[in-house]
């Protein structure tokens, strides 16, 4: 059995760690509420943008446009959104597993890493990191999202890449987050994604042309999805970290209870031993 001194040292160490996990949980809770509110404010716009593009493609007949077909290049850009810090449960590792477990050929991928954790993990696994940006995830802005999307879209229209994907964590609620890998370009709209109030039999004409309308709206569509993913990722990260720190705090409490019991047993044993020695000494004298 460990000595009382060793047990007290372990308890002190665990108590210090518990104070840290409690503080981190509190910070994550505050950040989560802020990020959650931001996501709730921006989601209606992004959903409307998606429905607009869905309706536009459904009502425009057959359109021959570069944004609607894969390029000749086999290269695929994948924007990977993770965090700069750990201690968030499986938040970062789930995104990495999503990439490594996908059908995408590693040799064809150009990784645009938003957040250090994803970059580090994929780099260790031999993926090519085309771009890294650790600052964007700390304070997402539509302007930064637009600047990166313009760069990737140019590579797409120039034929340097054939497809564009986005890997991020979808925020469902405080305790539920889902890693997702979606294709941004070429645009693929599922039939069920078109708003219910749209009549697919109605064709629309756009001025000056449908192709020129797509030239304007698709970049905004891609940027909107990307920015929305950034906002959801921040909320998911803080939700995951809050849960992880809550679990760590609870585990520390259980360990402290076990150590307290162990300490009391050791103390009781020491007292018993001392009494035994006193009684034995008294008996020897008498």
Which role fits each region the language model picked out?
Residues 1-286:
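C-terminal beta-strand-loop-alpha-helix "lid" module of Rossmann-like NAD(P)-dependent dehydrogenases
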């Amino acid at each position: 059995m460990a000595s009382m001194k060793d047990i007290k040292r372990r308890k002190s160490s665990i108590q210090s760690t518990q104070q840290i996990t409690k503080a981190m949980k509190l910070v994550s809770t505050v950040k989560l509420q802020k990020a959650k509110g931001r996501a709730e404010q921006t989601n209606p716009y992004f959903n409307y943008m998606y429905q607009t593009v869905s309706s536009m493609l459904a009502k425009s007949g057959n359109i021959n446009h570069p944004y609607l077909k894969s390029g000749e290049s086999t290269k695929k850009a994948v924007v990977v959104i993770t965090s700069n810090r750990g201690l968030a449960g499986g938040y970062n590792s789930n995104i990495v597993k999503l990439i490594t477990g996908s059908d995408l050929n590693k040799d064809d991928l150009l990784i645009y890493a938003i957040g250090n954790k994803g970059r580090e993990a994929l780099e260790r696994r031999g993926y090519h990191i085309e771009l890294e940006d650790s600052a964007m995830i700390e304070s997402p802005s539509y302007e930064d999202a637009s600047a990166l999307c313009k760069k990737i879209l140019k590579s797409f229209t120039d034929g340097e890449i054939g497809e564009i994907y986005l890997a991020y964590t979808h925020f469902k609620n405080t305790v539920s987050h889902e890693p997702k890998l979606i294709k941004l370009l070429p645009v693929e709209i599922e039939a069920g994604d078109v708003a219910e109030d749209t009549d697919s039999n109605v064709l629309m004409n756009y001025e000056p042309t449908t192709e020129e309308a797509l030239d304007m709206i698709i970049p905004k569509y891609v940027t909107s999805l990307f920015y929305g993913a950034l906002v959801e990722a921040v909320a998911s990260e803080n939700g995951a970290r809050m849960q992880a720190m809550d679990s760590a705090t609870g585990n520390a409490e259980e360990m402290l209870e076990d150590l307290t019991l162990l300490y009391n047993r050791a103390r009781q044993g020491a007292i018993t031993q001392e009494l035994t020695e006193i009684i034995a000494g008294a008996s020897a004298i008498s």
